[in-house]
């Protein structure tokens, strides 16, 4: 094969240092709200996998298209060697293992919504984008970073989607990788969607459920399409955010 496209190398390969600690742990997530110090974030084994794949007969290049957790790439541990391995991995990933587009999943720009998702703040996506752009410039590459976003997630309102449109426009994105929230069994988000309450805090959580509510949120992904402009402007007026009209479409 001239090229090997695979998901062999996402951070899902990372494991815990001491499983005995994990058995006693009551945290629902190893990486949220902060990366657990027991999580082994050394990226050297992952680099070894990449090198082994590239050394296979007939393999010219291996590409990682998605599955990258940029919050782990930005994480600073107490071990300098681990931090060095993360920097080496980040450069090698971007310089040698992207086929032109790297998909990542910030999922939203609202930190309030991201908190319900148990995802890092959107500012971390901005940090990773700067690193991605810098390495591309240094390597003489013109690759694209493709973000994935969700509308109608529990906790998300139309105003959040309107602000998402403004923020992603400012970053020069015309969004393509988008999805409407789909309830999935045994997740915090689905429990909040079904009950109307956050299962940990018991605070009320709004969820868009009707077709009208869902479309009102989804349309903001496509602010750049002429056919969506009138509906978006009308919606911004309805929710009292006329200040965002100029930010999306300029002075009238």
What are these regions (language model features)?
Residues 8, 99, 239:
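Short glycine-rich loop/turn motifs that provide flexible caps or phosphate-binding loops at active sites
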Residues 102, 106-108, 144-252:
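Flexible, glycine-rich loop/tail regions that form catalytic "lids" or insertion modules at the edges
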Residues 2, 78-79, 118, 129, ...:
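Short alpha-helical interface elements
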Residues 1-9, 14:
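Single conserved hydrophobic/aromatic residue that forms the stacking wall/gate
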